[in-house]
Amino acid sequence: DNSYKVSGGLHGVGVSVVNALSSKLELTIHRAGHIHQQEYKHGDPVYPLKIVGDVETTGTIVRFWPSTETFSQTIFNVDILARRLRELSFLNAGVRIVLRDERVALEHVFDYEGGLSEFVKYINQGKTHLNEIFHFTTQAENGIGVEVALQWNDTYQENVRCFTNNIPQKDGGTHLAGFRAALTRGLNSYMENENLLKKEKVAVTGDDAREGLTAIVSVKVPDPKFSSQTKEKLVSSEVKPAVEQAMNKAFSEYLLENPQAAKSIAGKIIDAARARDAARKAREMTRRKSALDIAGLPGKLADCQEKDPALSELYLVEGDSAGGSAKQGRNRKMQAILPLKGKILNVERARFDKMISSQEVGTLITALGCGIGREEYNPDKLRYHKIII
């Protein structure tokens, strides 16, 4: 009776739909020591359920032939099937799933004893990780099962995947909200206790904490509620506190018991906060318009008359005196002059926030017009196609 407590939905709806869209469907059920069988054609039973033999095992075999009257194409994409079956094997540690493609004599076997830990490891392969995988499983008092695995890597993207009763929610929901709240609280608490925020003079957000994070959040809920039939967002209100409490306890303990990992994670988060602040300053700088110059270009820039970047040249010269000489000798139509101080910052070795705070670098960014940072940079906006130093 407990087998279906955490199912994905109404039992039988899936097979009923497949049956309706198939020219033929065969059911073979091993149960109570017998083999039961029934066949359908275009959704209608050919004969009633009958016993055709004896067996000691239990299980169900479903075979179906997609209807060519309904579908113009009935070719199965093995990659899509493999992706979903691999996912199911990760979500159910120890369950062995075999996918055979008899068209090309290919067999995939999915069997992951490590469950979600192996899921995170699979996603993070080829990336440099900052900590060993954190993984816990717990059962809340209200019958909700919570399982989380996570690891930070050296990339800048957040990759958090959420599942309810093995069904993916691409739009997240209450389990994601609970996870994020606990993660941010746990990390902030650790950094405050270690006095890192005051020492580094940064304000950290949830987005900073999740930069480079790979996580799987899987919940088992007795009666889940979703925002739509496609189950893309979980809306069960009781799930958020269950996930938040479980994550709070387990993650706080992890940070205390793994000081080296906690230090590496905190360092990445502080870097992310600095980069975010630097990017904000960069955006403000590139968008800021000069009160005296409508184009918002640097005051020292002697721009050219030509508006076509392909025909325009920018000369970067050292100091105001050289700038004066260059301005006198230039072709105003196509040559722009930008005087810079002799020795500006070595941006290859400088941190992003230090680079942005340099007035000379800022002037250069504004003059070139491309913007800066992952979200703002656009080389198509370059104002000069020839740059002469």
Swiss-Prot record:
Catalytic activity line of the entry: ATP-dependent breakage, passage and rejoining of double-stranded DNA
Superkingdom to which the source organism belongs: Bacteria
GO molecular function annotations of the record: ATP binding; DNA binding; DNA topoisomerase type II (double strand cut, ATP-hydrolyzing) activity
Pfam families: DNA_gyraseB, Toprim
GO CC annotation: cytoplasm
Biological processes per GO annotation: DNA topological change
UniProt-annotated site: Interaction with DNA, residues: K343, N346
Keywords associated with the record: ATP-binding, Cytoplasm, DNA-binding, Isomerase, Nucleotide-binding, Topoisomerase
Ranges of residues in domain Toprim: 312-389
Enzyme Commission code(s) on record: 5.6.2.2
Protein's cellular compartments: Cytoplasm
Job of this protein: A type II topoisomerase that negatively supercoils closed circular double-stranded (ds) DNA in an ATP-dependent manner to modulate DNA topology and maintain chromosomes in an underwound state. Negative supercoiling favors strand separation, and DNA replication, transcription, recombination and repair, all of which involve strand separation. Also able to catalyze the interconversion of other topological isomers of dsDNA rings, including catenanes and knotted rings. Type II topoisomerases break and join 2 DNA strands simultaneously in an ATP-dependent manner.
Family: Belongs to the type II topoisomerase GyrB family.
Miscellaneous notes: Few gyrases are as efficient as E.coli at forming negative supercoils. Not all organisms have 2 type II topoisomerases; in organisms with a single type II topoisomerase this enzyme also has to decatenate newly replicated chromosomes.
Subunit structure: Heterotetramer, composed of two GyrA and two GyrB chains. In the heterotetramer, GyrA contains the active site tyrosine that forms a transient covalent intermediate with DNA, while GyrB binds cofactors and catalyzes ATP hydrolysis.
Name by which UniProt lists this protein: DNA gyrase subunit B
Organism: Acinetobacter guillouiae (Acinetobacter genomosp. 11)
